[in-house]
């Protein structure tokens, strides 16, 4: 069975070794044929905490790593220039 892959944007990086990736799925409405956008948020494993807010990433399906985390960061496609702030 092939592993699923998704491309999305990091919308939260506040957790340790975890990021939230928003994936936008666009499809035509079955009756009205208008293009509808649906956003799904996935929690993905980021072991080195390399992703920051706004990064475009590719995630892949993996074994369950926690109660809600079943995806892992495969690669960072577009890195944002936003520097991560250090809390004091």
From Swiss-Prot:
Pfam families: Ribosomal_S17 (PF00366)
Protein family per UniProt: Belongs to the universal ribosomal protein uS17 family.
GO molecular function, one term: structural constituent of ribosome
Subunit description: Part of the 30S ribosomal subunit.
Gene3D superfamilies per record: Nucleic acid-binding proteins
Domain of life: Bacteria
Keyword vocabulary terms for this entry: Ribonucleoprotein, Ribosomal protein, RNA-binding, rRNA-binding
Assigned GO CC terms: cytosolic small ribosomal subunit
Keyword Cytoplasm attributed: no
UniProt-listed PROSITE patterns: RIBOSOMAL_S17
Listed name of the protein: Small ribosomal subunit protein uS17
Oxidoreductase keyword on record: no
Example GO BP: translation
SUPFAM superfamilies in the cross-refs: Nucleic acid-binding proteins
Function noted in UniProt: One of the primary rRNA binding proteins, it binds specifically to the 5'-end of 16S ribosomal RNA.
């Amino acid at each position: 069975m092939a592993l699923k892959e998704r491309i999305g944007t990091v919308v939260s990086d506040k957790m340790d070794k975890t990021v939230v990736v928003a994936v936008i799925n666009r499809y035509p409405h079955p009756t009205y044929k208008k293009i509808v956008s649906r956003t799904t948020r996935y929690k993905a494993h980021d072991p080195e905490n390399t992703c920051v807010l706004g990064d475009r990433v590719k995630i892949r399906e993996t074994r369950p790593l926690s109660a809600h985390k079943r995806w892992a960061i495969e690669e960072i496609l577009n890195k944002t220039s936003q520097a991560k702030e250090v809390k004091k």
